[in-house]
Swiss-Prot record:
Family matches, as Gene3D superfamilies: Glutamine Phosphoribosylpyrophosphate, subunit 1, domain 1 (3.60.20.10)
The keyword Cell inner membrane belongs to this UniProt entry's keyword annotation: no
Positions bearing Phosphoserine: S237
Glycyl lysine isopeptide (Lys-Gly) (interchain with G-Cter in ubiquitin) crosslink residues: K232
Function of the molecule: The proteasome degrades poly-ubiquitinated proteins in the cytoplasm and in the nucleus. It is essential for the regulated turnover of proteins and for the removal of misfolded proteins. The proteasome is a multicatalytic proteinase complex that is characterized by its ability to cleave peptides with Arg, Phe, Tyr, Leu, and Glu adjacent to the leaving group at neutral or slightly basic pH. It has an ATP-dependent proteolytic activity.
Record-stated family: Belongs to the peptidase T1A family.
InterPro entries: Ntn_hydrolases_N (IPR029055), Proteasome_alpha (IPR050115), Proteasome_alpha-type (IPR023332), Proteasome_asu_N (IPR000426), Proteasome_sua/b (IPR001353), Proteasome_subunit_alpha6 (IPR034642)
Complexes and interactors: The 26S proteasome consists of a 20S proteasome core and two 19S regulatory subunits. The 20S proteasome core is composed of 28 subunits that are arranged in four stacked rings, resulting in a barrel-shaped structure. The two end rings are each formed by seven alpha subunits, and the two central rings are each formed by seven beta subunits. The catalytic chamber with the active sites is on the inside of the barrel. Interacts with CIC1.
Identification of the protein by name: Proteasome subunit alpha type-1
Protein species of origin: Saccharomyces cerevisiae (strain ATCC 204508 / S288c) (Baker's yeast)
Lineage of the species this protein comes from: Eukaryota, Fungi, Dikarya, Ascomycota, Saccharomycotina
């Protein structure tokens, strides 16, 4: 980049509302970089009657209570969310998503559908790219549920305000490796979900593919797992995760 171009970029990256001559919003690009700041990878897959999300869990200080560090949030009775990005922004996004879901239920008398919540959060993220007194949140949000009409569902939103549904998805620094692993599986299976009856088997599938893609082993304290069924969203305890890891080891 020439000196003039560098000066131009330096000027435009002070404004989140102004495009550079190259058509870029630098502050939004920086927000995308922030999503990998925590070096956490997550993965979401659909089963026959459930949706499973798993995330790495890294506790930065040995004196921290590990139960207070989480990237998976229960948004409503049926919707869960995993966040990639700084914890403060993650908690802010989770609080707003919970408020939106609660307001929807109060107003209309039924639970907010997963796709509607994802669209709403994406719209809010897009607004943050237009206002000078706001900044984009440096988080990518992945919502999971089992919808009454759509069945097992996964939706993802990003700092630019884009949202889309997925058959399976990965987020984080090793996103490409995990995605390639998943694509290879679905190419062979020729169906768009994990053809297992129980959520336990889908959890084992997700953990196995995370292990294969990252080339590392996990203990029960290295992972978080959330499961969405038709009736509820819940997270697994460390003991439940240990059971699934033992089952995976026995299969090998």
């Amino acid at each position: 980049m020439s000196g003039a171009a560098a000066a131009s970029a330096a000027g435009y990256d002070r404004h989140i509302t102004i495009f550079s001559p190259e058509g870029r919003l630098y502050q939004v690009e920086y927000a995308f970089k922030a999503t990998n700041q925590t070096n956490i990878n997550s993965l979401a897959v659909r089963g026959k009657d459930c949706t499973v999300v798993i995330s790495q869990k890294k506790v930065p200080d040995k004196l921290l209570d590990p139960t207070t560090v989480s990237y998976i949030f229960c948004i409503s009775r049926t919707i869960g969310m995993v966040v990639n990005g700084p914890i403060p922004d993650a908690r802010n996004a989770a609080l707003r998503a919970k408020a939106e879901a609660a307001e929807f239920r109060y107003k209309y008398g039924y639970d907010m559908p997963c796709d509607v919540l994802a669209k709403r959060m994406a719209n809010l993220s897009q607004i943050y790219t237009q206002r000078a007194y706001m900044r984009p949140l440096g988080v990518i949000l992945t919502f999971v549920s089992v919808d009454e009409e759509l069945g097992p569902s996964i939706y993802k939103t990003d700092p630019a305000g884009y949202y889309v549904g997925y058959k399976a998805t990965a987020t984080g620094p090793k996103q490409q490796e995990i995605t390639t692993n998943l694509e290879n599986h679905f190419k062979k299976s020729k169906i768009d979900h994990i053809n297992e009856e129980s959520w336990e088997k889908v959890v084992e599938f997700a953990i196995t593919h995370m292990i294969d893609a990252l080339g590392t082993e996990f203990s029960k304290n290295d992972l978080e797992v959330g499961v969405a069924t038709k009736d509820k969203f819940f997270t697994l305890s460390a003991e439940n995760i240990e059971e699934r890891l033992v089952a995976i080891a026995e299969q090998d």
